[in-house]
């Protein structure tokens, strides 16, 4: 589970990140990133629609992504929204981890 200070909860934050942030996509998810002010910390939010699957599948995908994001809590001030796509439902955690790392490297938020 992500620490409470790193969880995005407000609808306005999700909307702001999705509309104004940098966007990177692959077949498993769409990543929206807004770089924040230094010292603001990292906020992470997840959206998993019904297109991904039933409630059990959606929660499994969300839990996997949340667990993967724990490794990236050292990212400097940013707002990150991960929107899961249907292909993420049948994908292993290791594949999702690799895909997410590639997107963070492309955005300059993680080292190779």
Say what each PLM segment does:
Residues 1-112:
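Positively charged, solvent-exposed patches that mediate nucleic-acid binding
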């Amino acid at each position: 589970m992500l620490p409470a200070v790193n969880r995005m909860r407000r609808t306005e934050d999700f909307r702001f990140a999705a509309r104004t942030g940098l966007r990177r996509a692959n077949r498993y998810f769409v990543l929206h990133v807004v770089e924040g002010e230094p010292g603001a910390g990292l906020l992470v939010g997840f959206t998993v629609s019904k297109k991904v699957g039933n409630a059990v599948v959606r929660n499994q995908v969300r839990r996997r992504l949340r667990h993967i994001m724990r490794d990236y809590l050292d990212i400097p001030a940013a707002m990150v929204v991960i929107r899961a796509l249907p292909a993420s439902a049948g994908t292993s955690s290791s594949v999702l981890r690799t895909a997410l790392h590639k997107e963070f490297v492309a955005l300059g938020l993680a080292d190779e």
